[in-house]
A protein has these predicted regions:
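Short, charged/polar surface micro-motifs in flexible loops or helix N-caps
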Residues: 14, 26-31, 40, 61-64, ...
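Short, structured protein-protein interaction patches enriched in aromatics and acidic/basic residues
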Residues: 46-60
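Phosphoinositide-dependent membrane-docking surfaces
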Residues: 17-25
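Compact, glycine-rich, soluble single-domain proteins
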Residues: 30-49
């Protein structure tokens, strides 16, 4: 069985790093529409712990995960996990 790599998205919430397709800033209009569509299809996961949403993570299962961390922080964490292999 292979080891699973977990990406910390804030407040002790984690996502399987291999399933992440995109990390985007939450303010863009297309991302807001994506967020609304995910909510309608019950594929929206709020991992902000009541804080302001700064990043939106899209997974290969079409789930949209909201994070209060900056997109650059999440991207850096993903790069570090990928570099470790």
């Amino acid at each position: 069985m292979s080891a699973v790599t977990l990406l910390n998205v804030g407040f002790d919430n984690v996502v399987i790093a291999e399933r992440v397709i995109a990390v985007a800033a939450a303010e863009a209009s297309p991302i807001k529409r994506l967020r609304e569509a995910a909510s309608r299809h019950q594929k929206l996961i709020d991992a902000t712990n009541g804080r302001r949403t700064r990043a939106v993570i899209v997974t290969d299962s079409d789930h949209v995960i909201l994070s209060s961390l900056q997109p650059s922080t999440l991207a850096q964490r993903l790069q570090e996990l990928t570099a470790r292999g």
